[in-house]
Amino acid sequence: MAKLRFIVVGSGWRSLFYWRIAQALPERFALCAMLCRTEEKAEKMHREYGVPVSTSAEQCIALHPDLVVVAVNKASIAAVSTEWLARGFAVLCETPAALEEDALRALWQLHRQGAKLQVAEQYWLYPTLAKRLAAVRSGALGTPQFVRLSVAHGYHAVSLARQFLNAGQQPVRVTGRSWTEKIIETDSRWGAVHNGALVEKTLQQHTLEFAGGGTAFLDFNGVQYHSYLRSTHTSVQGERGEVFDDTLRCLDAAGEPVCRQLTPLPDPLAAAAAQAGLNEDETAIACFLDRMQGYLAGGAEVYPLADALQDAYLALLMERALAVPGQSVESTPQPWNTEER
């Protein structure tokens, strides 16, 4: 298989993930250029990281990339993605696809008109989460009824919850509440923090009740992404058993209770990524990029756009629920719920 050639639009923290992936797995990926807004930023990215850079969209177009990765600030993702789709390129945009319902619907309309758009929702490809999803999907728990997630925020959490519960595009009722939590900061995007600073962070809790009967309890504080004092947790329960983090408790074929530890799924690319020094988030994105090859060749979507838009839409409902604690916010039908995909 030929390597995937792509450009990245954006030069922030997230864009560097794609550069590290291309560096770690050069036989599969080639980052042709990073499109920066200013000469100063382009010079900085090239000087500090060795990234091939440009400030000209025309120069990037002339490179004839297979894919355009849009990794700009959240408020600009939808507009920038639309610009590159209009130029005739396939686009993989960072999450969320948009921050407003109208923009989500507009992206769906572009998809219906044939635009090649995917959203880089990667959490289901985390090796630790992939094995838990596989255990649930194996039927070992029976029908998943409850999922408790303290793994990620917003649309990422919604994506996982819907998959663990096999909830698809079901209508949902959302309630939410938030608290301020004091914690000593120990880590960050840029590395460990040792100054003992006591900071205030926001803990958010949401309940999502799906029309099909499954319920998700989402509990997350943004500090969990980078902290030595706060871990993450996953619990999924069905009538025949439970997955709690990496432990599966269930009944065997004879009806006897068994308990076993989940092991990583066989995935040569994930193994190669880890061996090359990529972290779990980068590994998941690398796996997503690799699957984009098939999509670009006319195959199935990597993560259906309808699901990515539903994730973003429900994340908006979660924000609204926080503004009315004790009250519920209900989803309404969206075009991607029912239209042919």
Predicted regions located by residue number:
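C-terminal helix-rich "cap/oligomerization" subdomain common to oxidoreductases
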Residues: 1-3, 59, 67-69, 115-116, ...
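Short acidic low-complexity segments
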Residues: 52-63
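Beta-strand-loop-alpha-helix segment that lines the small-molecule cofactor/substrate pocket
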Residues: 66-67, 73-74, 78-124
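Short, well-ordered coil/turn residues at beta-beta hairpins
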Residues: 71, 94, 210, 219-220, ...
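N-terminal Rossmann-like dinucleotide-binding module
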Residues: 1-49
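Rossmann-like dinucleotide-binding domain that binds NAD(P)(H)
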Residues: 143-231
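Rossmann-like NAD(P)H-binding beta-loop-alpha module
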Residues: 127-146, 157
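C-terminal glycine/acidic-rich active-site capping loop/insertion
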Residues: 224, 232-306, 327-331, 337-341
